[in-house]
Amino acid sequence: ELFGVEVECDTSSYEYYISSSSQLKNDKTRQWLLNSFTVSNMIEAGRNMKDRILFEEIPEGTEYLQTVIDAMQRKKELKIDYKPFNGHQSIFHLQPYAMKVYHQRWYVVGYLKEQEGIRNIALDRILEMELTDDSFILPNDFDAEEYYAHTVGIFVNDKLKPQKVVVRVFGVHVEYMRSLPLHFSQQEIKTEHKEYSDFEYQLCLTPELTSQLLAMGEKIEVMEPIGLREEIRKRLFAAINRYK
C-alpha cells in the first residue's frame, strides 16, 4: 500500500507476484521509493557492516519535504524565507508544481508570485517554510517531465530552444557514456573503432551543460554547435591561464 503496488497470489502454485509490474516499471517515483526501501532493509539486515557501506552526505532541507508534498496535494501556496548562495535573503510565495532531485539536492519547481514566473527552489537554501491557506490552480498544460525534457540539470530558461549538440568521446570513456548517458536524448551516431564515438543530443545550452562538459576535460571534444564549442575552448584556456 505504501508504494501503490498490488501483490497477488497464484493459488495453483501458491506463489506471490506483482500484478501491476508494468505500471511499476513506468512509474519512476515508485521505482525510486521501492529501491530506497529495499536498500534500507538490506543495510538494516547487515548492521554490523554499516561502517563499510558509505553514502554521500545529503544537504539540509529534507525536513521540508512533507510540507511541500502536502502543499502540492492540497494545491496550497507556500510562504518561504529563502537565501540563495549568491543573493540576498528574501520572503516570497510559491505555488508548488513538482519536485526534482539533482546531485543529492531536492528542488521544488513552481510559480513564484513575486517574480511572476516558474522558478526552481533548492530546499537546502530555505530558512523557513509555511503552508498557507491560499489555494492555486495547477495549469493543465504543465508537465514536469516535459519542463525538464531538453535541459541537463535543474536550470530552465523558457527563452532557450533545444539545439543539436554533438560530443566526441574518446577511449574508455565511451563505455562510461554508454552506461550513464549525459541525457536521455543521447544517440550514438558514429563509432571509430576503439578510438572515439560521437554522441548526439537535443539540448538547451544552459550553464549546467557547459559545466558538465568542462568536467569531462580531455575525455571529450564538443563538435557542434560552433558557439558551444567556442565557449568550451575559451573556458579551457582560461583554466590553463590560472596555472601560469
Identify the meaning behind each predicted range.
Residues 1:
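DNA-recognition element of transcription regulators
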Residues 4-83:
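Bulky hydrophobic/aromatic content
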Residues 10-12, 102, 193:
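Structural motif
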Residues 82-86, 112-115, 169-171:
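Short acidic, glycine-rich loop/turn motifs
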Residues 105-109:
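Short aromatic-glycine-enriched beta-strand elements
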Residues 116-147:
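Flexible linker/loop signature enriched in Pro/Ser/Thr and Pro/Gly
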Residues 149-244:
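Polybasic (Lys/Arg-rich)
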